[in-house]
Amino acid sequence: MADISLLYPKRKEVSAMTLTDESINDLSVDYIVESLTKDIYEKNSIKKILTNLTCDIDVINYRADVFEDILNFPELRDGLVELLKKLEDLRELEKFNKDGDASSLWQLINRLREIDGYVLCITMLKNILNTIPIKSQGLLDLKQTIEDIYNNGGFDILKKDIDETMAKAQNLKSVTIGVNLDSVLKPKNAGVISLNSFEITNSGILKNFMGFTGSKEELNSDEKVLSSHKLHPANPSLNRTKFGSIQQGANTNVHIDTSGSATGDDPLSQSLKKVVTDILKRMVKSIKATLQKYVNISGYSLVGLMPEIIFYIRFAELVDKMKEKKLPVCKPLAVHDDRVAYGEDIYNIKLAIKRTNGEEFDIIGNDITFDNEQRIYVMTGPNRGGKTTFTQAVGHCFLL
């Protein structure tokens, strides 16, 4: 997946030039980006693409063709929007895995989630691209890559393995914990009573409690537990205190038992964490064996498509709004002829954005030609006569 891009043709080495801060300001790039999305990640992705320009004719036409497909097929766009949600999950998972403090246990479980997300995204892309008559080389190349992966003899086995392993991992819904108390009814240690395939509800807890309070046999004598862990004192101080002393807390007085060394952690939470971790360690042995077969698969390779998909979709949404306002739009054609540019009825996209936001005013289009006969224009006219607006519109034609 690393060599697939919706911005650049395969095996195409292209140099790009980055707009200066002055040019970004003159072209109101931030205004345009802000109108497309409020999501910070999306804004940064779109701005990065907009401000890194290429003059390569093949790349420009390649992008125009991809955008045409995404614009012309709303069902393609809808499918890609759903795909973005799954890719966002993978992106968040990737950020978590870069956390050096994450335990090996959770890294293993997240590796399972990563491959599961990979399988899901490949399947979604296949279903999306196979049902739409796309024409652009970029999307056709992506379709072929997905087909090659999906039809590979190992993909069905991968999908089956991951589905079965995820089912095992997701089957554990709750753990019933028993907490031992000392002579003054303070938590002493905790043990696992049962592993459950159902979630415990508040109503169930209340029902059991009411049953206990109304029962003739008030205490259960069954001693069987699966495992137990010692509890450390709650809210310990750095100094050792005598049994029965009172520590002044931020909001209330807390009774401290200092029979063990201070840890600074909530005792019950820490004990439960250890119990659950021990259970999961046993459960993930089969997961680890499954994942070792797929060490070369990276679900994060698909995340690289996110900024490109976002870029096309958000501009397609803007063009749809412009069409609703009867504003003219067209597909540009980049030609190999030396230093020529022709624009007919061009207008400033900032005005179009204001129209789509509900402002009512007339937009006047203008023609522009750059060739050997007309290379330099001198703009004259009164203040607020449209000189800056028109000059910016010319810049937008090249930017977009």
Question: What are the language-model segments listed below?
Answer:
Residues 99-130, 137, 141-149, 153-350:
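Conserved P-loop NTPase architecture
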Residues 2-9, 18, 308-385, 400:
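Conserved NTPase motor "head" modules and their coupling/switch loops across ABC/AAA+ ATPases, GTPases
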Residues 391-400:
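GG-anchored amphipathic helix commonly corresponding to the ABC/SMC/Rad50 NBD signature/C-loop
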Residues 1-192:
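Conserved amphipathic alpha-helical "coupling/scaffold" segments
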Residues 385-387, 391:
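Conserved glycine(s) of the Walker
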Residues 194-200, 360-363, 398:
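Short, low-complexity, polar/charged sequence segments that are solvent-exposed and flexible
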